[in-house]
Amino acid sequence: MSINRNLLNIIIILCICLNLGCNDGAQERETDSHTIQVSSLLPSSSSSCVLSPRASTTKSSLHVTHRHGTCSRLNNGKATSPDHVEILRLDQARVNSIHSKLSKKLATDHVSESKSTDLPAKDGSTLGSGNYIVTVGLGTPKNDLSLIFDTGSDLTWTQCQPCVRTCYDQKEPIFNPSKSTSYYNVSCSSAACGSLSSATGNAGSCSASNCIYGIQYGDQSFSVGFLAKEKFTLTNSDVFDGVYFGCGENNQGLFTGVAGLLGLGRDKLSFPSQTATAYNKIFSYCLPSSASYTGHLTFGSAGISRSVKFTPISTITDGTSFYGLNIVAITVGGQKLPIPSTVFSTPGALIDSGTVITRLPPKAYAALRSSFKAKMSKYPTTSGVSILDTCFDLSGFKTVTIPKVAFSFSGGAVVELGSKGIFYVFKISQVCLAFAGNSDDSNAAIFGNVQQQTLEVVYDGAGGRVGFAPNGCS
């Protein structure tokens, strides 16, 4: 009888093993990693553009295109080859500028009050590589213009005729305010002109009683011109009269191709603040993982996924353009990294649409790099590039198994990164971990746009929170 009972126990155990898996290590490797085709890491060679269904069907939604992709109006259906080293250089310039602005180390000298073309003082505003673009209608009649959208900037601006000193090369016709019946300049005695200090870091000045703005970016790009009000058209049903924007008559720098910038920051002159009665300071986006696909930028709460998990906006960025986050943990391959809570809580963190590579405090990055390399030990390493020091040569492999990486934020939001949110690919023989360490423990962490790809990212300015959900572009 005991033999039969023992046999029965063995059978039960075998059944459990077959159904649930008795090899914990094997199960952990399967569920805590991505196995993908190496070729899928490369940019698509397709010359066609796949439109995001979200942007095509959701109210108040715009298509988001990659600056170098086939979907961009700027490229006439042909992808352009980005200079990755230059992108990373500009990215570091942006990060340096963000950190300087947060630590209040940059000078905030005023724009000279003599001429509208005077170069403003360096103010700590941020540009970077400006990877993602939307098309917005400006004026009456409407002029469709391609603008970089940026959660780290407040003032929306575009190049305007006449170019008093210089304008950079722009693919679309430069906006001519004299041909718009809805354009008018703003007085230098207005409250909006007085708000320029907080929106741009430079006080407004006067030219024949008209308000002059000036903004200079961390890479020495700049725009100077008239603060004005104009009609903005997002969609046929989303039209706003009297939106404050900068009409730049002296513009220079690395904006080449685009008309200007759409400011999505937190200041009262930002686009979300100016349209708050319509959208309640809510907008969301999904950044496409491929340059041959579009994502979306949607204003208001329409179409936001019920699966979005929110985290409170932290106080670290109060008084700035930025949206702060509280990172509480990072996991690699299902294992929580041994990072003391003070590593993140002391400098704080923020999310930024314009920073490419996620930056972490030195101790946090060291823990991430060490764990990731250990789990990728079967793949040969190769030399790093610029700010990226952990790279792999995958040229001898058809598939690659990548440990999953997830970020946990206060409030219970957990963001698991897709495979394209983990790597920055130069070529198959040089596939790099898309994270970098800050130069100092006091510098804030920045959740960059490589890690945001394909996520639905929701900014609820009125509710003081940021949310995340997977599969945001579909």
Curated annotation (Swiss-Prot):
Residues 1-25 form the signal peptide. Gene3D superfamilies: Acid Proteases. Induction: Up-regulated in AED1 mutants. Transmembrane segments: none annotated. GO terms for molecular function: aspartic-type endopeptidase activity. Residues 444-474 form a propeptide. GO terms for biological process: proteolysis. It comes from Arabidopsis thaliana. It is an enzyme of class 3 (hydrolase). The keyword Hydrolase applies. It is a lipid-anchor; GPI-anchor. It comes from the Eukaryota. InterPro entries: Aspartic_peptidase_A1 (IPR001461), CND41-like (IPR033873), PEPTIDASE_A1 (IPR033121), Peptidase_aspartic_dom_sf (IPR021109), TAXi_C (IPR032799), TAXi_N (IPR032861). Residues 132-469 form the Peptidase A1 domain. Disulfide bonds join C391-C432. Keywords: Aspartyl protease, Cell membrane, Disulfide bond, Glycoprotein, GPI-anchor, Hydrolase, Lipoprotein, Membrane, Protease, Signal. Its EC number is 3.4.23.-. The active site is at D150, D352. The keyword Oxidoreductase does not apply. Probably not redundant with AED1 and not involved in restriction of salicylic acid (SA) or systemic acquired resistance (SAR) signaling. One of its GO terms (cellular component) is side of membrane. This is Aspartyl protease family protein At5g10770. Pfam families: TAXi_C, TAXi_N. Its main location: membrane. Belongs to the peptidase A1 family. It is found in: Cell membrane. A lipid is attached at N443 (GPI-anchor amidated asparagine).
